[in-house]
């Protein structure tokens, strides 16, 4: 039986992604030769190993020393139970997904049912009830590296926010969920949705903190 790290290696080979192994004090990373992303496989025995405090300190040190490099943590249970989502997320960080530019999208308020259905398919933790729900709809394409689209505006990303709580004179909101269409990277999507939400609350005369 192959290890979880070997499973990920086989997946990378399927997509012809060059990589190398890096081991730091017993923790094995796989580094993409394509864009330098560090992949940290977390198997089912990860939290049962000796000296978890040392491991946590080591991971913090690695993050500090490689602050210019993206580190992706892949959990074995999610890899097996959410195959499409976890693999799509990994490919996105490796720069191998289709791209859609947020500037070619419009934002609309969506229903709880729309948000829940989209998140159930495209977010590892599924949907959740939220006070505010917004969808990013693709309206046009500009060609180039952007993927082709149908004529009808398509829901490509969803963001949800909680009800506000007043803290020190500010209305504090929690960003509960964000997900893009599986297999697709929305360039600028998170920023566009967040800015829209903040500006809308400010227009209502509220001081906002997220």
Task: State what each model feature region is.
Residues 1-21:
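Acidic-basic catalytic patches of nuclease active cores, encompassing PD-(D/E)XK
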Residues 5, 51-59, 190-196:
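Well-ordered, non-membrane alpha-helical segments in soluble/globular domains
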Residues 24-42, 133-134:
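Short acidic loop-to-beta-strand element that houses the catalytic metal-binding Asp/Glu
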Residues 34-56, 164:
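Short beta-strand-loop-alpha-helix junction that forms the active-site gateway
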Residues 44-50, 78-80, 182-183:
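Short acidic, S/G/P-rich loop/turn micro-motifs used as interaction or catalytic elements
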Residues 51-82:
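Catalytic cores of nucleic-acid endonucleases
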Residues 85, 89, 94-207:
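A conserved beta-strand-loop-helix scaffold within acyl/acetyltransferase catalytic domains
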Residues 210:
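Conserved beta-strand-loop-alpha-helix junction that forms the acyl-donor binding cleft
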